[in-house]
């Protein structure tokens, strides 16, 4: 199975490295040329180039800037390539929900929402009744380096 990861920042590289270690054939794409294995230079806002990349794989994992996800999802739906993203952006998720496609589309599959929802669901199943569940996700570093004392992730 061939998996394309769009976005070669910290998260995208980590996803690609993990998938490759599990035996998947992985291509990783970004607009900035990176010296990493199986790298493809790609401007994800260029529909022609994006379509060519999407057609070359079975699954796309979008780990790029959230505002590019609508276009990436549209191309995946048109081409028939399964799509995952890590966005928390509800506008992107609503756009994907409205796509007329039989292609597997899975927005919001990152940490929160995503993994935290799976954890909550698993915990809920262990009880007879549940009145309320509150899950929180944060990134509090051991050695804060900014005024917010919070770990800045993604494109910060």
Each model region followed by its residue ranges:
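Rossmann-like dinucleotide-binding core of oxidoreductases
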Residues: 103-156
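NAD(P)-binding Rossmann-fold cofactor-contacting core
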Residues: 24-37
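Glycine-rich Rossmann-fold phosphate-binding loop(s) that bind the pyrophosphate
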Residues: 8-9
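Conserved Rossmann-fold cofactor-binding substructure of NAD(P)-dependent oxidoreductases
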Residues: 44-56
């Amino acid at each position: 199975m061939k998996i394309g990861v769009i976005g070669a920042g910290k998260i995208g590289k980590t996803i690609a490295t993990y998938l490759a270690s599990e035996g998947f054939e992985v291509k990783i794409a970004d607009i900035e040329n990176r010296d990493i294995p199986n790298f493809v230079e790609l401007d994800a806002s260029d529909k022609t180039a994006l379509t060519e990349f999407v057609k070359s794989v079975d699954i796309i994992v979008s780990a790029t800037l959230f505002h590019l996800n609508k276009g990436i999802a549209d191309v995946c739906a048109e081409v028939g390539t399964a799509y995952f993203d890590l966005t928390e952006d509800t506008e992107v998720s609503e756009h994907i929900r409205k796509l007329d496609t039989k292609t597997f589309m899975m927005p919001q599959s990152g940490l929160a929402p995503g993994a935290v929802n799976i954890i909550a669901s698993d915990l809920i199943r262990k009880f007879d009744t549940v009145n309320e569940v509150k899950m929180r996700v944060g990134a509090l570093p051991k050695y804060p380096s900014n005024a917010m004392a919070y770990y800045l992730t993604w494109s910060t």
